[in-house]
Amino acid sequence: MTSSTTSSIVTRFAPSPTGFLHIGGARTALFNWLYARGRGGKMLLRIEDTDRERSTTAAIDAILDGLKWLELDWDGEVIYQYSRAARHREVAEQLLATGMAYRCYATAEELVAMREKARAEGRTRLYDGMWRDRDPKEAPEGVKPTIRLRAPLTGETMVEDQVQGRVVWQNENLDDLVLLRGDGNPTYMLAVVVDDHDMGVTHVIRGDDHLINAARQKQIYDALGWTVPSMSHIPLIHGPDGSKLSKRHGALGVDAYRAMGYLPSALRNYLVRLGWSHGDQEIFSTEEMIKAFDLPAIGRSAARFDFAKLENLNGHYIRHSDDAELVRQFEDVLNYVPNGAALKAKLNDATRAQLTQAMPSLKERAKTLLELIDGAAFIFADRPLPIDAKAAALLTPESRALIGRLHAALSAVEPWSGPATEAALRAFAEANNLKLGAVAQPLRAALTGRTTSPGIFDVLAILGRDESLGRLKDQAIA
């Protein structure tokens, strides 16, 4: 691809703010972003807020926050479709002036009767064109007209789709669609075409549930004499069983994945592989995605969402993340989880240092940030330590007596460090003719309240001398 073509690429992500940024929308945004970034182009963001009753500020904020969290930046200012209504009306009037549109005075009752008749006769064209060639002087009083496109009655409308291939519709099946409602508000179909044209969009990449819209919009482009942008309609995301994606399958907002402890880098990697492939490669850095992504490599069949695969991929990203970056992500996710505020209140320079020290071990056994938080709970626990059922079963009277002797042995360790406490524990086990595991298990239960944790020598080093000895004293029997 030459620089003369790549520099002019413009994609757009155009969500409707009637709900949060769902997982399918996030993938659409990612595909638009990758295609533009890989070709030195721009990705624009347009909020399609023409449905005034359902559009909410909260949904707009959630969409913007979701994109920022996924690190999908857009170029220029956010464009709000509703603010451009005057321009949309201007284009509708332009089509009237050229004879490519007409005023329709059909009443609501007449339209209902038309639809019922068409359905009874098995026709997909529901509007019968009653005002298409009728003299406006015959207009009934008190009826505010709509403006309809004078769509071709014969022939076919064709779109060369980069994913779906050549798609053809018979014009006899397509209505004279409404461009401007009786109240003067533009329809979605008109607004999208005008906005894409005025924004200089060269490539429309969206879900294949919009494929029928492509036929309608192509007719509007043709009526205006405008160049039709390249179209790519990507398959939807289905559940693991091939059915429509539901909430239990993963049809959640991006904010939910954030609150479940997924990393944005992992979610991006997972989403790019939903429907797109590049050989057998599964793990992609952002740079690799940008370089490799192309539209013809997107499959036509629906992708299947797999939570287990996402979780495993997230675990990979956690294990390979920088410890300091994981601490930052750890802090961030506390804003979105139950009891996160209480844990955040305990974060200070000392606990951050402990968390950073524990991270190499914690991240090896965590697939999500929530598991990371759970694994780090021993750092933030208050004395007396809460003991879970499995740990309590280990803390028998004999074990508590052993902990009392361990407390005495460890009290003599100076200076306190992982190697020093390890040497002391090994010496204690040998002197008492015990295996190290027999010492480590009750020790772990007393120090963390659990039966799983980072290595016991690491735990002692992370907690430090005073906290370690204090917790042992709480569980010991002298």
Curated annotation (Swiss-Prot):
Keywords: Aminoacyl-tRNA synthetase, ATP-binding, Cytoplasm, Ligase, Nucleotide-binding, Protein biosynthesis
Xref: InterPro entries: aa-tRNA-synth_I_cd-bd, aa-tRNA-synth_I_codon-bd_sub2, aa-tRNA-synth_I_CS, aa_tRNA-synth_I_cd-bd_sf, Glu-tRNA-ligase_bac/mito, Glu/Gln-tRNA-synth, Glu/Gln-tRNA-synth_Ib_cat-dom, GluQ/Sye
Residues making up the signal peptide according to the UniProt record: none
Catalytic activity: tRNA(Glu) + L-glutamate + ATP = L-glutamyl-tRNA(Glu) + AMP + diphosphate
One GO BP: glutamyl-tRNA aminoacylation
EC number: 6.1.1.17
GO molecular function term, any single one: tRNA binding
Motif ('HIGH' region): 15-25
PANTHER family associated with the record: GLUTAMATE--TRNA LIGASE, GLUTAMATE--TRNA LIGASE, MITOCHONDRIAL-RELATED
Binding positions (ATP): K247
Function: Catalyzes the attachment of glutamate to tRNA(Glu) in a two-step reaction: glutamate is first activated by ATP to form Glu-AMP and then transferred to the acceptor end of tRNA(Glu).
PROSITE patterns (UniProt xref): AA_TRNA_LIGASE_I
Subunit comment: Monomer.
Record has Nucleus as a keyword: no
Motif, 'KMSKS' region: chain positions: 244-248
One GO cellular component, as annotated: cytosol
Source organism per UniProt: Bradyrhizobium sp. (strain ORS 278)
Family of this protein: Belongs to the class-I aminoacyl-tRNA synthetase family. Glutamate--tRNA ligase type 1 subfamily.
Protein's cellular compartments: Cytoplasm
First-tier enzyme category under EC: ligase
Encoding gene (name): gltX
Protein name as annotated: Glutamate--tRNA ligase
Main localization category: cytoplasm
Domain of life per record: Bacteria
Keyword Plastid: no
Membrane-crossing segments per the record: none
